[in-house]
Amino acid sequence: MDKQEWKSFFRFIEGGSEAELQQRKDALAGVLQKVTDPGVRSDIRRMLRLIDEEVLIRQNLSSRRQVRRSKSA
């Protein structure tokens, strides 16, 4: 992927809903099974890792917010 494609992907990750992220992850996982080019496979695996990372970050932030709310209540 070129620089512009990566920038577009990062914008998607930052702005996409959890459902959109999951849909993209599922689609990428399906493509990964069909692709044989090592460079493309590497890009897809990186994209999958980045999506997983974003989902975990969002879950962590959500958990922290809930803890703060319960402490202030």
Named regions from a protein language model:
Residues 59-73:
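Short, charged, intrinsically disordered terminal tails
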Residues 22, 38-49:
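Short, charged, amphipathic alpha-helical segments
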Residues 17, 55-57:
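Hydrophobic side chains within alpha-helical segments
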Residues 1-34:
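N-terminal acidic leader/helix
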